[in-house]
Amino acid sequence: MRKKREFIDGVFYHVTSRTNDRIRVFENNLGRKIMIITLQDAKEKYHFKLANFCVMPTHIHLLIKPSFGADLSKIMQWLKAQTAKRWNFTHGSTDHLWGHRYFARPVKNSSEFEYVMKYIDENPVKAGLAAAPSEWKASGAFYRLHGLELVDSDLFDRQPEVILL
């Protein structure tokens, strides 16, 4: 049996989750749309802060701070299960969508926060999917540029105080 993950309240986590066998599930607009809508639904259900995200063809990146007392594992379990359910429904499939575990790393300070923000933003550029971060529509960079609400842009006015580690 796996050891239960322990998380620290009030801290941002850089979360990465891969698709099963790195299948390019989110390669097309429908796949990315399913992921983003499910992420919006998860945000409404669990009330977490989302500083950044990026939906890549074979994986996702999140920079997320669960609300106090919330369990990041439950958030990720729900997010991955709902995405798989919606994907399978729209594709008439029963396949496993996600790989086994997600990776979650606490963000320790403001310089690391800035590094993770940039790392997530640059992911589609490094993969050759976009010339600039804000050109990738399934990303926090695009959402911030266009004032879309999924990303909590108010966090950037008070960035140093949101990181408590």
Residue ranges and their predicted role:
Residues 1-58, 65-165:
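Short Pro-Cys-Gly-centered "Cys-loop" motif that presents a nucleophilic cysteine in a tight turn
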